[in-house]
Amino acid sequence: MFLSERHLKEKFWENYNYSGRALRYEFESPIRDGNADLVTIEIFQDNVQINAFEFKLSDIKKAILQAKENSKYVNKSWIVIPSEKENLILDRYKSYLKEIKYVGVIVVEESGRWKMIFKPIFRKNINIKNNILKLMLQEI
């Protein structure tokens, strides 16, 4: 059980990016009114992919709404929640997630191990904000 969103975010990030999969990343990225918790620039199947992540311990509705808004500016948008919320997502929100298409769900165990329980569709046409361009152009 995570006591804070910060702890959830740190554990997830430590395990998600252990191999350096994110070429660029920014926490609290201003891609919309209010920030996305994390934005990454990655190469996946030989294509550039921009991801946004929202971390929540509770208030799943808010997380989904934020991720839905983020999805306009990225290829894939994710909510990242503790693993004990998995059944809640599958029982209560799965049909809504299918409807909005571009939002996926990742659950994280206390150890940091994570799994995708709902896969979003890749959005090809996105509104690229200036801060995402700046992030992409930063030197490694």
Give names to the regions the model predicted:
Residues 41-43, 108:
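A generic structural motif
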Residues 2, 29, 56-57, 83:
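Short loop or secondary-structure boundary microenvironments that flank
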Residues 34, 49-51, 75:
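A generic structural signal for short beta-strands and their flanking turns/coil linkers
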Residues 1-34, 44-46:
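Acidic-basic catalytic patches of nuclease active cores, encompassing PD-(D/E)XK
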Residues 99-140:
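Non-catalytic C-terminal interaction segments of nucleic acid-processing enzymes
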Residues 12, 38-40, 49-59:
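Conserved catalytic cores of phosphodiester-cleaving nucleases, focusing on short active-site segments
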Residues 57-108:
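Catalytic cores of nucleic-acid endonucleases
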